[in-house]
Amino acid sequence: MTPHISAKKDDISKVVLMPGDPLRAKWIAEQFLDQAKLVNEVRGMFAYTGQYKSKTVTVMGHGMGIPSIGIYSYELMNFYEVETIIRIGSCGALAPQLKLKDLVIASKAWSESIYAKDMGVEIPEDKILFATSSLVELAKETAIKNKLDFHEGLVFCEDAFYQTRKDVISLAKEKNSLAVEMEAHALYANAILLKKKALTLLTVSDSLVTHEALSSELRQKSFKQMALLALEMTQKLI
């Protein structure tokens, strides 16, 4: 038990899927997990543990932004001894080749956030942190097996959703960032610090290139494909 998670240690699987929205965690549990049990609802951040194809999986929301996922992923890895966290979320396309609904495997992330530095993680000059390579390969293999197209590469992890500094977005494009999101850098920092495994999977929900955006219905449909990809990955991790 922590200040933010009330679950018993045995209630949390060694592999956790983390959407940003706790209601999506609830939806995944209801749609895909057998014998799903609510194990946390502190601050409305729902966590469910259940069975997917006879393997025990936990699905828990992480909230919005670096500080939020920083807290939840750290507590899961450090106090609940979770070995692997896969974030499943949305992103905004920065690269012209990314279309709405495309799947992005974020093998690396960069940010101007000081979170990683504050946690004592050594930051390279380019500020890029990497996902766990074995998870990146597993995600690609699983996507190919399930005939899902994907893009793999660098994402920009920003602190401000309503970003007004145009130079930051320009810099992100100059670094060949595929997309922008708000959590991957902190998740990877915690995994590096605690010697755990982490990966971020993203669905393109809007484009900063074409200024298009998915409807709520299409967001849910594309999110379903990504959630199933992550769930299929768990079969090789547990």
UniProtKB/Swiss-Prot annotation:
It catalyses: a purine D-ribonucleoside + phosphate = a purine nucleobase + alpha-D-ribose 1-phosphate; a purine 2'-deoxy-D-ribonucleoside + phosphate = a purine nucleobase + 2-deoxy-alpha-D-ribose 1-phosphate. Pfam families: PNP_UDP_1. InterPro entries: DeoD-type, Nucleoside_phosphorylase_CS, Nucleoside_phosphorylase_d, Nucleoside_phosphorylase_sf. Phosphate binds at G20, R24, R43, R87, I88, G89, S90. Its EC number is 2.4.2.1. Keywords: Glycosyltransferase, Transferase. GO terms for biological process: purine nucleoside catabolic process. It comes from the Bacteria. Catalyzes the reversible phosphorolytic breakdown of the N-glycosidic bond in the beta-(deoxy)ribonucleoside molecules, with the formation of the corresponding free purine bases and pentose-1-phosphate. Belongs to the PNP/UDP phosphorylase family. Homohexamer; trimer of homodimers. NCBIfam families: deoD, PRK05819.1. This is Purine nucleoside phosphorylase DeoD-type. The lineage of its organism: Bacteria, Bacillati, Mycoplasmatota, Mycoplasmoidales, Mycoplasmoidaceae.
